[in-house]
Amino acid sequence: MFALVLTALVAPSAEGSGLAGIKAILNGVRGLKDVLSMKTMIVKYLSLPAVLTAGLYIGKMGPSIHIVTCAAKNLLKFRLFESIRKTKTLKQEMIVCGIAVGCAANDGAVVGGVLFGAELVGTYYSLRNYFKSFYAAFIACMTSRLLHSAVNLNIKPFLTWNVKIVPPSFTLPELFFMLFVAIVMSFVGIAVVFVNEQLLVLRDKYGKLHLGPFKFAKYATNKLVILTENRIIFTIIITLVTSFLSFPQMIGKYMSIGGVPIFEELLMAKPLTTVNGAKGEWIQGNISEVFITISIFITVRYILAILTTVLPVSGGSYLQLLIIGASFGRLVGEGLAFILPDGFSPNHPIVPASYGLVAAAALTSSQTQAFSSVFILLELTGHGVHLPALGASYIGVVISRWLSYSAYDFVIKFRKWPAVLESTTDSDDIRVKYVMQYVDSLPILEEKASLRKIGEFLEKPDLAKTIPIVNNKSDLLLVGCVNTKKLQDYYNTMKPTLEGNPDYDTEIEIEKNTCPITISEDTPLVLAHLLFSKLNLDDVFVVWRGRLIGQVQKSSIIAELTDRNAGFGDA
């Protein structure tokens, strides 16, 4: 309840994992100041432990990354980092380093964290940031592990999850079954994204209504009235249902086990019995009971995890997807081991845990569309390389990108943040000439103009931030550009001269800047996307042999791509 009230009243942007907002910012969206604000960081830092201790089926990797990224962004306010704050590219690199640090500090995954940060950026990543990210992630990982060792009074500086799958954990015939598991989990990941999207639509439509038929309009000015909204009541109900299902005398015998321990248990190399060290009562008598218990576990966990993901509290989904994937893979592995007790070849029995690892990799990769998620998983479990898991992750990403979009992209689309995502610019068939504004409708200035003409020009409504300067309106040779605000300031300075002498009509040469970036009308939109993403531009002039023929704006690209995607979806 503490986390719910704190998030709802103080920082609503602290809900969820926060990774979608980070991706939107890294893809050029402006105006999302609350996503990486100090207020959001503090609220998330205080509410995340409360949500985790409440027993809700959520993870902490995404929120941890969000907290560290907020810290990295707010560090730029100090004078020490002033040079970084003034450079757009370095500011972006600082945020990407924050992603790597958050992942490394939370999971001890240095390589996976850096790669995840690179994938979260979008299509284009500055390779010069690799060393910085690896260095920051290594320091974060070492510090986190050493502090963990100090708290637990042990001498092990590195902590990985207790997963022991002794190689070789599979034979060649088993690769076909692992392929089947990967394909199934890929579609499950797509289903997770789709269901989450529909639940968010419902929450947005009905979540802010108040307790059914009761009217609270007269209390609308009171902030506390937000606690009577349906989304708040729904959160309390989900918490109570989760607590009820975790009761030890019912299915809580295996549902109540924490996130990491249950994942370790599902990847046990031995059968899931208490004799072998299992904490959950998966098997009480006959070995075949494991099929019933795991089936119940998957069903309940899947439903509650999806419902919990859309609650207005801090929390991620990565750990829960690992658990759901591992449980399905374990179920398939146990089935094969039951049918083929000796395996496909002598002295090579089937290891159900290996199927769990493959399924977990496929499900997380399908939901995030990030191949780096498998490296995070392998670092967590202490496995440097597991070929079936790598293959499963690749299958998950390919199928998901073919049929759907990632969990982060759907939030960006749902919130209608103006981000140009890489999934919408894969085709070279879309050219700049289809989305640009032609010169006939552009406000332009000649390089030599009178104050009176400049004043009349500035009276035009909806002027762009940058005005093109041409040699004359017949040749339209682009000679530079001028900032609208600077032009307005210059005119205001010279305006008294014009008012004191109405006949003053001397032409002056406008102080202009060069246009370092221009493109042609046949430039593919994917290349224009590169310019807007990496250089953080709002608009670019389109020229042909030095002649101004138009201007393309970031908003026009977003509108065109949105319309094309909508048309494709309707078809």
How would you describe each model-predicted region?
Residues 554:
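Short alpha-helical Gxxx[C/S/T] motif in the catalytic ATP-binding
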Residues 512-513, 517-522, 527-531:
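C-terminal accessory/binding modules appended to enzymatic or scaffolding proteins
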Residues 551:
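Short, glycine/charged-rich "phosphate-handling" switch motifs in NTP-dependent
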